[in-house]
């Protein structure tokens, strides 16, 4: 037993020396447990002493378990504190770092070096090994560290200044551009622009990064795109009624030179440069121009045997070209003809269509408060004359005031062919009605019964009755009484002011009446009474439209030329009843704004 006491005292000494360390305490307790176990074995013959030792062992084991759990919690706390300290240190180091700069990659010079542009200077710097060789592209944005070494690569610049392309230089990688104040700059073409395959044209708007001198992309200019519609309209000559003679003339002027160029060359016949379509409103001028482009595309495809042949229809909205800034309208006209030349150089026929031509190209010197036509007209004249040596381009103009267009535009050699689009007569009106009133429409049973159920005969009879109502010289059809300057008077009927647009409107009114009858009385189908009633409604609606304040100008727009008109009196009794005519007040001086 004395030996065992010595072991306990030795263990107690070790415990005292390690009281400040939890690990030392655990070791001490484990050793004491081992000593007690030995004592337990030695005291196997002494039962009472063994029970006391066993109780002591259990107490020590419970103490060890508690200290172990406490130790694990302390270890976890220390680990968490260490992680927080490391994160804070990293954050402090990150915040203490100097700012990173950006530059534009210019060229890879090998051996891990590259030329960049940053801070207004061109520099040769090292490239980080983390960036694979050959991945940097000219014009690309790169990140620089404190030592101005390339450490990361990004995309390409997406903001900057808008410049206008003047020309591509011989090396193909640089271009001459003009800025806002017409200053000229030589810039580099960024790789995305070179690889995009976009054909750069003089006048294109480009995105430039002014500090590095790179241009990155072509910016569409809405001011030009809105004025030009390159799609060929899906309208054929079959959809146009009552204008067979005019269609034949324009086909001879436009299609023959492109379909049979050898015959024209053999006869030394020069194709016409332009066509003027003139006449009163609503008679199909714009419709014919659209059909020309569609028909020309199909004819060229038939002759060449290829479905890939295109024709281009450049639809120029006249009033939208006008700009208050001097030279802007002329610039737009140049861009339009520049685009026409580009398309024509590819072998495709191009039609440049000016709608409402009188709004742009008025007679020079006729302006009251503006003289823009003094420069716009010469610009068009020079462009048309410039088309002389260029094949596959023709100019088509449409106007209802051809008397206001400058005579220099209308002379032979510019707009060679002049086609008047007349108001439809009775036969033409039947043809136009036939485009809108067809056998596919639902027809009333009573009307069908009158013609033995034959839909074609029913439609023909309905059109015949409607045209007779419109073109008969009866009192209900009297529209205006005009007084000329020489005192003569003339009665005009609604037929004198009929148009394809009015006929379409009459048919639409009749169809609407048929729908209302079906909803109210459950009687389905179009009737001749609907068409006749629509004629009356259309005539009534047009009663107040004649301009009695300046009847001569109104008559010119409506297609009535000749002796000057001084008075107009409407003969249709309107809602107010009585005479609605007014005489013309003669004013000595109206000033420049009237």
Swiss-Prot record:
Transcription keyword on record: no
InterPro entries assigned to the protein according to its UniProt record, in alphabetical order: AAA+_ATPase, AAA_ATPase_domain, ATPase_AAA_core, ATPase_AAA_CS, NA-bd_OB-fold, P-loop_NTPase, Prot_ATP_ID_OB_2nd, Prot_ATP_ID_OB_N
Annotated binding of ATP, by residue: 282-287
PROSITE patterns linked: AAA
Pathway terms, separated by semicolons: Protein degradation; proteasomal Pup-dependent pathway
Pfam family, one: AAA
Gene Ontology biological-process entries: modification-dependent protein catabolic process; proteasomal protein catabolic process
Keywords noted in UniProt: ATP-binding, Chaperone, Coiled coil, Nucleotide-binding, Proteasome
Entry comment, domain topic: Consists of three main regions, an N-terminal coiled-coil domain that binds to protein Pup and functions as a docking station, an interdomain involved in ARC hexamerization, and a C-terminal ATPase domain of the AAA type.
PANTHER family: AAA-FAMILY ATPASE (PTHR23077), PROTEASOME-ASSOCIATED ATPASE (PTHR23077:SF144)
Biological role: ATPase which is responsible for recognizing, binding, unfolding and translocation of pupylated proteins into the bacterial 20S proteasome core particle. May be essential for opening the gate of the 20S proteasome via an interaction with its C-terminus, thereby allowing substrate entry and access to the site of proteolysis. Thus, the C-termini of the proteasomal ATPase may function like a 'key in a lock' to induce gate opening and therefore regulate proteolysis.
Similarity section: Belongs to the AAA ATPase family.
Binding partners and assembly: Homohexamer. Assembles into a hexameric ring structure that caps the 20S proteasome core. Strongly interacts with the prokaryotic ubiquitin-like protein Pup through a hydrophobic interface; the interacting region of ARC lies in its N-terminal coiled-coil domain. There is one Pup binding site per ARC hexamer ring. Upon ATP-binding, the C-terminus of ARC interacts with the alpha-rings of the proteasome core, possibly by binding to the intersubunit pockets.
HAMAP family for the chain: ARC_ATPase
Protein name, as recorded: Proteasome-associated ATPase
Species per Swiss-Prot/TrEMBL record: Catenulispora acidiphila (strain DSM 44928 / JCM 14897 / NBRC 102108 / NRRL B-24433 / ID139908)
